[in-house]
Regions:
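Alpha-helix N-cap/helix-start positions at coil->helix boundaries
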Residues: 21-25, 57-58, 94-95, 129-132, ...
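Eukaryotic acidic, Ser/Thr-rich intrinsically disordered low-complexity regions
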Residues: 193-223
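Structural signature of alpha-helical solenoid repeat scaffolds
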Residues: 32, 68-69, 105, 142-143, ...
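Alpha-solenoid repeat junctions
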Residues: 71-74, 108-111, 145, 178, ...
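Amphipathic alpha-helical scaffolding segments comprising HEAT/armadillo-like alpha-solenoid repeats
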Residues: 39-51, 75-88, 112-125, 149-162, ...
Length: 223
């Protein structure tokens, strides 16, 4: 098992505890090494989860991402930490909301029941002020919908709105949710073929047009 570094904190002028930057760097390198060593994931879930209490948002973000990947592979071993992971959906830090969504999406792909209690809050973040969070919301939804598409039956309108998002990257990703659902539950999204067709012909971003065409193809191929 990986041995956590003995971390020292210092107090800044505001009385806040901050991590020594060199220690933070070493810990991040350690986590990056563990990320590549998938054979050690199962025995290190508890250790990585303990880092959710770390004072460094960079370390917490890395831990959240890793727990999502670990949870996809070992969902039965991540159950005790899902509540803590979901608590970051309310974080004041954009990055931590992103990573919480990413993690819950991967865990939910493996076992929807593990994240079901937090599904409503996940959906709320579709309207987050941060475009990166909205993007992560779509990614998480694609993961969950891969194996539990029925969870989205009453939420299609949310993704219709995201097709018109002001952020280019969000608009690029939004049609992908229609592609995922089109392969599994085309009846949920077939009524939006006309809108997707318009987007595929008129959106200013080439990737948006391509992804919209891909969504249309997926829907029509499975009706």
């Amino acid at each position: 098992m990986y041995n956590g570094l003995h971390v020292h904190y210092t107090s800044n002028l505001k009385g806040e505890f901050v991590m020594n930057k060199e220690i933070e760097k070493q810990l991040y390198v350690e986590l990056s090494s563990l990320t590549k060593n998938k054979e050690s994931w199962e025995e290190n879930i508890d250790y990585v989860a303990s880092l959710l209490e770390n004072q460094s948002s960079k370390i917490v973000a890395k831990a959240l991402w890793m727990l999502g990947e670990m949870g996809l592979k070992y969902p039965n071993k991540i159950e005790n930490y899902v509540n803590k992971i979901a608590s970051f959906l309310n974080s004041p830090y954009d990055l931590l909301r992103e990573r919480s969504l990413n993690a819950l999406g991967r865990i939910g792909r493996a076992d929807f029941n593990l994240i079901k209690a937090y599904f409503g809050k996940i959906m709320d973040l579709s309207k987050d002020n941060c475009s990166n969070v909205r993007l992560s919301f779509i990614w998480a939804s694609e993961n969950i919908a891969t194996n539990t598409p029925t969870a989205y039956r009453e939420y299609i309108s949310i993704f219709v709105e995201l097709l018109d998002d002001e952020d280019n990257r969000v608009r690029m990703e939004a049609p992908e949710m229609f592609r995922v659902l089109g392969k599994r539950k085309p009846e949920y999204v077939k009524k939006y073929i006309e809108k997707l067709t318009y987007i595929s012909e008129h959106d200013t971003e080439r990737v948006v047009r391509i992804h919209s065409k891909g969504a249309i193809k997926a829907i029509l191929s499975n009706i």
